[in-house]
UniProtKB/Swiss-Prot annotation:
Pfam families: Ribosom_S12_S23. It comes from the Bacteria. Gene3D superfamilies: Nucleic acid-binding proteins (2.40.50.140). This is Small ribosomal subunit protein uS12. The lineage of its organism: Bacteria, Pseudomonadati, Pseudomonadota, Betaproteobacteria, Burkholderiales. It comes from Paraburkholderia phytofirmans (strain DSM 17436 / LMG 22146 / PsJN). Residues 1-28, 103-126 are annotated as: Disordered. The keyword RNA-binding applies. Belongs to the universal ribosomal protein uS12 family. InterPro entries: NA-bd_OB-fold (IPR012340), Ribosomal_uS12 (IPR006032), Ribosomal_uS12_bac (IPR005679). Part of the 30S ribosomal subunit. Contacts proteins S8 and S17. May interact with IF1 in the 30S initiation complex. With S4 and S5 plays an important role in translational accuracy. The modification 3-methylthioaspartic acid is found at residue 89.
Length: 126
């Protein structure tokens, strides 16, 4: 334990919190170009083919981003928007695609939670 004199001389050092999405550099979203679009398998108790993309951002970072929703139109050289948010069962995936912006289309026939998937409201007649 420090003495009063040591505290007067040095003071306490506050712990700095590390960013969970460093590639965004304190921005809400970042634009990037897909360099590879592929599927990968999740960690142990789960089983699926999760859609992910390797994206080169405008600030030079290269990150892996998750493509949420059923079906997508992304391929190499697609321009996409990335937001923070990890996928718990995919190691190294710390970002999500923003559906319905730039080259990423919204999810087709989506009825609920539409804003998260860039889906427009269905016509009243249908």
């Amino acid at each position: 334990m420090p003495t009063i004199n040591q505290l007067v001389r040095k003071g306490r050092q506050s712990e700095t919190t590390k960013s969970k999405s460093p590639a965004l550099q304190d921005c809400p979203q970042r634009r990037g170009v897909c360099t590879r679009v592929y599927t990968t398998t999740p960690k142990k108790p789960n089983s699926a083919l999760r859609k992910v993309a390797k994206v080169r951002l405008t600030n030079g970072f290269e990150v892996i981003s998750y493509i949420g929703g059923e079906g997508h139109n992304l391929q190499e050289h697609s321009v996409v928007l990335i937001r923070g948010g990890r996928v718990k069962d995919l190691p190294g995936v710390r970002y999500h695609m923003v559906r319905g912006s730039l080259d990423t289309q919204g999810v087709k026939d989506r009825k609920q939670a539409r804003s998260k998937y860039g889906a427009k409201r269905a016509k009243a007649g249908k």
